[in-house]
Amino acid sequence: MRPDSPTMAAPAESLRRRKTGYSDPEPESPPAPGRGPAGSPAHLHTGTFWLTRIVLLKALAFVYFVAFLVAFHQNKQLIGDRGLLPCRVFLKNFQQYFQDRTSWEVFSYMPTILWLMDWSDMNSNLDLLALLGLGISSFVLITGCANMLLMAALWGLYMSLVNVGHVWYSFGWESQLLETGFLGIFLCPLWTLSRLPQHTPTSRIVLWGFRWLIFRIMLGAGLIKIRGDRCWRDLTCMDFHYETQPMPNPVAYYLHHSPWWFHRFETLSNHFIELLVPFFLFLGRRACIIHGVLQILFQAVLIVSGNLSFLNWLTMVPSLACFDDATLGFLFPSGPGSLKDRVLQMQRDIRGARPEPRFGSVVRRAANVSLGVLLAWLSVPVVLNLLSSRQVMNTHFNSLHIVNTYGAFGSITKERAEVILQGTASSNASAPDAMWEDYEFKCKPGDPSRRPCLISPYHYRLDWLMWFAAFQTYEHNDWIIHLAGKLLASDAEALSLLAHNPFAGRPPPRWVRGEHYRYKFSRPGGRHAAEGKWWVRKRIGAYFPPLSLEELRPYFRDRGWPLPGPL
């Protein structure tokens, strides 16, 4: 034994104290939990993630709640029994296409609980899935605790809707929510419902799964821009973005009219956040925290400047995995018996102690290791896509949407086009005196005098698809003809998706048409702004010709759609 080791030094120190008359003071009472030696508040130690898990679960539950709320309010009109693209027709067509496959093969290719349900009342099925999701997500959001079963239920319920949602659920944030939700399953113990499950510390593998997710999201978004539209390289994209984004809000109106140098600064800042900051994740604790702060602030700016559904709120969730308990402690109250106090006590208990092996812990550790191996394996095509000069964005490589590619605004439209639906009560649609009246949607631009909407994190799926439809033809979007037919019949479900029906309290229109317009923000202080107009619009031409109910009868039957209203 070394002579300068602690065990040899202790007797010598004791002997010196006796020779000099020094005596040990009376032992002091240990400080109260959550307090320092002088009674000051104790600080949480770094390296544990008990509070991080609570914040992660609450944030994820909030996004789930919004997603299921959107589903409950809009699914019947979009994919219900008489929806614009009924999911029953979609499921039957899928079943017929794979009629030579086993039921398990069909289910594994497109997993959804709806395969196991009665299709005679699809509206009730869709409502049931959405209400279950709302109930479970509300519980997790309020309590901050969950187990693997509850989180798996949320993931399975939402995946069941995404896989039958057709184009209405084709946005990149659907897969992103499913991947985030899948990781959320492994944050929790199997059975225990506790905010601080003592024997189930937050898995480092799961935390790195979240960090790997935010790394891919941000780097993928940055690379798709640099490889995509030239305006990202010459720093001019922000000259157009606020005006041409899918659903502008009032702040976007003013940001669009910012000085040119401010737009250049925005674009450079975007490249810094998306291309350089993601690598902070691998540079130690402090750099990782800086990464999390910058990403959350960046998403907050995007929320303020546009209505991008719950995408930016969702992107904040994996960023929270950058923070440990010491970083997030300020979010929780102090005091005896508080969560922070209990975490501090748990940190003291486990410091230097070796936990006794438990069967549940062993099983969970094996599950986490398996998760890590699975994520690594499924990441191979994703990494190859990131490195490819032909990078694709918002693509999933498996039916479970576990590891996906991401990206946004790889190209920026320089002009804003809108499809305006109009109806007339005139018996002759081509008559010069036919009076055409506009239908107004809940959020997308229509009436130039209407203030842009402010709805984030909520999401109007029809309005978003109308934005995409304006860049294509109606032949590529047959659902818009279905919508026209429903407007001709004054269908209540379809009208609930709109903000204004010009024929309310009157007989339905005899004809409905689609008109193509170009929209630009009015200039602050200009003539149009003085008239109260946010937009200036100019007609491009017809989007689809005037249609009547009788003309649409064979069109509906060929697609298996129920005939609307009086037909």
From Swiss-Prot:
Gene Ontology cellular component list: endoplasmic reticulum membrane
Keywords carried by this UniProt record: Chaperone, Endoplasmic reticulum, Membrane, Transmembrane, Transmembrane helix
Matches recorded under PANTHER family: LIPASE MATURATION FACTOR, LIPASE MATURATION FACTOR 1
InterPro entries tied to this protein: LMF (IPR009613)
Protein's name according to its UniProt entry: Lipase maturation factor 1
Assembly, per entry: Interacts with LPL and SEL1L.
Protein task: Involved in the maturation of specific proteins in the endoplasmic reticulum. Required for maturation and transport of active lipoprotein lipase (LPL) through the secretory pathway. Each LMF1 molecule chaperones 50 or more molecules of LPL.
Organism the protein comes from: Homo sapiens
Cytoplasmic topological domain residue ranges: 1-49, 152-207, 322-367
